[in-house]
Curated annotation (Swiss-Prot):
Pfam families hit by this protein: PNP_UDP_1 (PF01048)
Chain positions recorded as substrate binding sites: 78, 152, 173-174
Function: Catalyzes the irreversible cleavage of the glycosidic bond in both 5'-methylthioadenosine (MTA) and S-adenosylhomocysteine (SAH/AdoHcy) to adenine and the corresponding thioribose, 5'-methylthioribose and S-ribosylhomocysteine, respectively. Also cleaves 5'-deoxyadenosine, a toxic by-product of radical S-adenosylmethionine (SAM) enzymes, into 5-deoxyribose and adenine. Thus, is required for in vivo function of the radical SAM enzymes biotin synthase and lipoic acid synthase, that are inhibited by 5'-deoxyadenosine accumulation.
Identification of the protein by name: 5'-methylthioadenosine/S-adenosylhomocysteine nucleosidase
Reaction(s) catalysed by this chain's protein: S-adenosyl-L-homocysteine + H2O = S-(5-deoxy-D-ribos-5-yl)-L-homocysteine + adenine; S-methyl-5'-thioadenosine + H2O = 5-(methylsulfanyl)-D-ribose + adenine; 5'-deoxyadenosine + H2O = 5-deoxy-D-ribose + adenine
GO molecular function, one term: methylthioadenosine nucleosidase activity
Top-rank taxon, per record: Bacteria
Subunit structure: Homodimer.
Active site residues according to the UniProt entry: 12, 197
Alphabetized UniProt keyword annotations: Amino-acid biosynthesis, Hydrolase, Methionine biosynthesis
Amino acid sequence: MKIGIIGAMEEEVTLLRDKIENRQTISLGGCEIYTGQLNGTEVALLKSGIGKVAAALGATLLLEHGKPDVIINTGSAGGLAPTLKVGDIVVSDEARYHDADVTAFGYEYGQLPGCPAGFKADDKLIAAAEACIAELNLNAVRGLIVSGDAFINGSVGLAKIRHNFPQAIAVEMEATAIAHVCHNFNVPFVVVRAISDVADQQSHLSFDEFLAVAAKQSSLMVESLVQKLAHG
């Protein structure tokens, strides 16, 4: 099995990249793909850049050039579920856009024409992630993760997300675009991120302070998940 891993920012990929053996780097379309072995398992790690377009472009390049069997999206996220704290893990069972609106033509809020309203994560990947969470004794929540091209740092944006997606557990800027591409390529995916901030008016301060904590936790989870998928 070859496992694809996608993170948006340098801080979100550096810990994993440094552990890849026999590493080779491909720079393409503003993205970087690192291939090699992570604890003996073939991986292709992508640093995509921030936002939905960068994530979709990167995911497509990774699938075409890295040929992974599954995709894990890692990194940081803003917490929406009330129980989440900085460093906790979120696992997607579904991903949706929070900034897409074609409701004038009868679509659900967040749904794009020709697409499902949400993109379902793979059940086996979810189960493997939850097994890793239990083994590592981490605090985690599974549920809907929503994405959009905005860092949520104020009451208006937060209220809109809570109104349209009251069940959402976390918000970030890439996961749904990656899920969308995986859906089109029929490649299983799961989002496994760590909380860097609680989405509120002070979230930008929390993000700057705790990004390193989130990156460490998400990298720990992904490394464990890669082992679980490769060896059971």
